[in-house]
Amino acid sequence: WDNTLRFRHLLWDQGLHLAEAMDTAQRGAGVDWHTASELIQRSLTEARTHPLKPRVACGAGTDHFAIKQLQSEAALIAAYSQQMEMIEAAGGQCIIMASRALPAISAGPDVYARIYGYLLEQAAEPVILHWLGDVFDPALRGYWGYQDIAKASTAVLSIIEDHQDKIDGIKISLLDQTHEEAFRKRLPSDVRLYTGDDFNYPALIAGDGNHYSHALLGIIAAIAPALVQALEALAK
């Protein structure tokens, strides 16, 4: 724990904020929700002691339940709510992560709209949505109720437009620069696009002169010193 938190301080010292328990909360490394929740609580406690008062956003999902236990809208809402409430109680911002349980029950766009609508309305503060593509996780194919990316985009944009006062932004991890650039043009002006594109992030962050993506991706941790200097130069 000491080394884990020390690394977060190194990032904060450079003026960066933190997205906590994202990859770990997907359990790819075998980290369960009990451990992830402790990581979230420890990071938020440390953040409060840091002089720069960094922002910490944390991944909320449904993975403390098996998919076979999440066969109804009520069960999915309850599972998401448990993680969101824990994050909010600890003082963090919620990132609503994609749940494998939704494609598993072949949820249509109306189901996504109802579940996300409920979660957004109960959120204490604006949240970040996360659209993780099947290139990262094949079990998420068909998210937002459509296999077709254009139709899925329209579905999630409808959710955002209906609840934009409760949405800080949306992180997109599809590895498709053209799609991301087109999608962010359609967002309400006060909703951010957070890129998760590990291949095209420099161009997406730099923007096209009118729109740009914010950075929310793991590669930044590995190149933080160089990245901070680059961002400072870009700001000039």
Please place each PLM-identified region on the residue numbering.
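Catalytic alpha/beta core domains of metabolic enzymes, predominantly
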Residues: 124-236
